[in-house]
Amino acid sequence: FLKGAGVAAAAVAGSAALAGCSSDAGASQEWLPKSWDYECDLLVIGYGGAGMWASLIGADECGQQVLVLEKAPVRGGGNSSINNGEFAVIKDAEGMRQYWHEMTQDVDTPSAVIDAWIEEGLRNCEYADKYELEYDINEQAIAGTIPEYSFLPGGAGCQSIADPPGFGMASFEILDQKRKDLGIEVLFDCHDEHLIQNPDTKEIVGCTTMIGSEEKTVKARKGVILCTGGFEFNEDMKRKYLKCYPFKFEGWKYNTGDGIKMVEEVGGKLWHMGMAGAMYGMWTRDPENDFLILIMPPDQTFIYTDRLGKRWVDEMRIGSPHNGWHAFTHFNDEICDYDHCPSWCVFDQTLFEAGPMSTRQGDWFECGNFTTMLPDELRDWEGWSDDNQAEVDKGWIIKADTIEELAAKMKEIDKWMDVGTLKATIDTWNQVCENGEDPEFHRSPATLNPLNNPPFYAYTVYPGSC
């Protein structure tokens, strides 16, 4: 949400606000740096969506001198600048409040936090209009029904969604220009920050940061706001906190949990660490392109199997783009591991020839880590190919003339794949398609397409997303 006048003293989405230094903090104290390389009223660490709004409101509405530190070498923007760019439009505050209490079950989320979210969320369009964002208000998000669990008490009709044309990329360009107009400085290539804390009062008075290979000190006279995003690209944190592993992501590769480490160093406590707004997609298994890709099959000629080669789900109804990962948390004691993580998407030449399996540059849904609006230094790849062949050539999709050969190649990637089991699964699936009924998982008859047109293909499916 877009935080209003309280941004300099309270949390905004994806950020944490830390109190500034006291007036009697003398430079002679040992815990203070001998000198400051930069000084400001309000220090914002991270220039994604939360950092963008914190800096704008801090300077424009609160009248503070703001300095922003950004990890990326240029531009910044975070996930907010390469995703759909949607934001909530609250229609019924009391319904929304009831919904949040039902969804959180009043566990670990204080009512004051919910109330603050709603109070400021009611002003989203006000702030969007003030800063001249373009948007349309719709009753359904690109990702589907809103709110996510609208069947809960209070959920139905409590909110709409604002969709900006050009997605988050266009909104970022508008707001970044507003930031420049306000004279807010952003320092790029900033990393490895450590907060500077008064050991007696516990106040945060600034930070140290590496800019390139040089350590710099930054003094914050009024406060520090951490807007450093999540830990999508920190394997240790994902393994430690998330509810299954491996978990793979596309999106902003600089999200490595830096702010979480900073807070822990000064005695901060963590909460909600096992939560993720994510679905599932294809992991490339490519060290040079180490990210997830959202697959949008142009045809329904495919199935999902678990790691052992067994089909486990109605592939058309795994979950929404924000909760689809839940289906991958199944633990199998027979292998002492998560048997849906990874899963495999198995298909044949019919799907391969049906069209591109993901988004290309120039498509209507061109957003993510390949968009042409990203500078070369930040763009991870050039988007999906027109005919799917480049992804086979790179090894992202494996190919074989027979199911047995395909299963053998899959087993080279995951030892738990069983050749005989996968062959039996495909045979059973083809019989299901011939019968026109899926008695085990009840997939829609209109989508029951056999896998009998060689060659055959497969790719790994992991929980995760943007």
Residue spans for each PLM region:
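Glycine-rich FAD pyrophosphate-binding loop
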Residues: 61-80
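Conserved redox-cofactor binding core of oxidoreductases
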Residues: 76, 119-215, 235-236, 283, ...
